Amino acid sequence: EIGPVVTNALKTIQPLEIINKGLVVGMEIVGVLYAQHVYYLPEIMMAAKVMEVGIAIAEKQIPGGRTSKGKVVMHVAEGDPHDIGKNIAAVMMRSSGYEVIDMGKDVAIPDVVACVEKEKPFLVTGTALMTTTMGAMKDGAKVLVDKGIKIPYMAAGGAVNRDFAESFELGIYSEKAPQTPLIAEKILAGYDYLKIREEWDDIVGGE
């Protein structure tokens, strides 16, 4: 249903306004309702898909496309096949104006490192739903540090908690997908991973 709605709106409204003041705001509201346990995963997935389709239609009317705020590499930890959370976060990052390099699920540490070296993102995110796989994020962050790459490494997913995410150098935590763009904004504003940890509660606010 979103296709005809966006197409009709484009007759009188600029595409960026449709994206930023319509679709993105709508998804932010969905994120709040999810945090309040009014919406659950099925509603989040449906809203994310609707928003993705709507943004794709609106973006086609922007000469040269939208200017990217920055690049982020996203993946699911090695050995872990669960990618729903990562997919939702990726949609929310794209809708917020970021270029997402989505590596998919069960991504080997060397592949993550190689992608970071090639793409030069300002942030790398990993998710894990299994406790047996979350250690790959800690190991991956160590490889980046050893190579002199000091970008924040966001750890997320059902198996991950804040204590784990902040137990290794570069590590920061995201509890829910809607928090990812909020944290990304602070990184672009100059916050390093230590500053993100220090102000985490204020950054994520009510999400």
Q: For each predicted feature, which ranges?
A:
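Long amphipathic alpha-helical segments
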Residues: E1-G65
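Residue-level signature of catalytic and energy-coupling elements of molecular machines
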Residues: I2, H37, H82, M93, ...
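Short, hydrophobic beta-strand segments
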Residues: G31, K71-H75, P121, G126
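Short, flexible coil/linker segments at domain boundaries that flank nucleotide/cofactor-interacting
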Residues: T67-G70, G148
